Swiss-Prot record:
Protein name: AKT-interacting protein homolog A
Intrachain S-S bonds: none
Main location: cytoplasm
Manganese keyword on record: no
Length: 293
């Protein structure tokens, strides 16, 4: 039996005995409780430790979000799962991410740019999430091949994410916003406080030369598209050249599924129930026998 409940029941008995000796007034009798409404706690494991006596001070410490330290790993896993669910629901155009097999704190991704200065660019990246997420700093986003851009470090390939998220606020900022920001920088160029001063100066002073270097950067990134991932992981995003034997069948299945979905949605729209009789503008004017199935 849990020592915490033994201690509590003993203290209750002592208080009741003292109250009987001291009190001289009429006793108040509470109405009897029905046994059916009595709640019981689940069984306590044999090696369980009372919550009033932590094993060590470190276990009684709470994180900044008020979560007990022993729940930290579970809370982190739940937070990351919720974040990935939000990413899927947002359906960011041209952005695809996949959490790592080895660590949920590392996500692999790729951005497809369809128009603008960086048109036809395919940029692979990795997102690094702090181990104290969501209470730490903002996640980091590093491109596999440094892109020629004012906000991308020309050596490390890291994007200046802190520009958009100076202070990461839990329950307000989300990873999908970081991904959207990474996509937006290729369509809206910002040159203030750049990580790549050369790119910023060329964009301001010589746009044609800037465009030329961007084209070269896009070609460089695309030339490394089929390289093996820098981080060995079963869930890393890998591209391979088009193979008709493998890819034609998959392509046909995807197109067939898309066509089937479009036909179903179109059929539902045409044959849906209507409460207006053809040729009439009055609501609820459809004949009753037409509603029978």
């Amino acid at each position: 039996m849990n020592p915490f409940w033994n201690m509590s029941s003993a203290s209750v008995r002592k208080r009741s005995e003292n109250d009987e000796k001291i009190s001289t007034g009429d006793q108040k009798i509470s109405p009897p409780r029905s046994s059916s409404a009595k709640k019981q706690l689940p069984p306590i494991p044999k090696n369980a430790v009372p919550i009033t006596k932590p094993i060590s001070p470190s276990l009684s410490v709470q994180s900044t979000n008020g979560t007990h330290a022993s729940y930290g790993p579970f809370y982190l896993e739940y937070s990351l799962l919720a974040e990935f669910t939000l990413v899927v629901k947002q359906k960011l155009p041209g952005v695809y991410v996949q959490p790592s097999y080895r660590s949920a704190l590392m996500w692999f991704g790729v951005i497809f740019i369809r128009h603008g200065l960086y048109q036809d660019g395919v940029f692979k990246f990795t997102v690094y999430i702090p181990d104290n997420y969501p209470d730490g700093e903002c996640p980091r986003l590093v491109f596999d091949v440094p892109v020629f851009h004012p906000l991308v470090d020309p050596i490390s390939g890291e994007l200046d994410v802190k520009r958009a998220f100076t202070k990461w606020r839990r329950n307000h900022n989300h990873i999908w916003q970081v991904l959207m920001y990474a996509r937006r920088i290729f369509y809206k160029i910002d040159t203030t406080s750049p990580l790549n001063p050369e790119a910023a100066v060329l964009y301001e002073k010589d746009v044609q030369l800037f465009k030329s270097k961007v084209v070269d950067s896009v070609k460089l990134c695309n030339s490394h598209l089929f390289d093996q991932p820098k981080i060995e992981d079963p869930y890393a995003i890998i591209f391979s050249p088009w193979n008709p034997v493998l890819h034609d069948d998959a392509r046909e299945r995807m197109l067939a599924q898309k066509k089937k979905s479009e036909e179903q949605s179109k059929g539902l729209h045409v044959s849906g129930l209507s409460w207006v009789k053809p040729g009439s503008v009055l609501p609820f004017s459809k004949e009753e026998n037409s509603l029978q199935t």
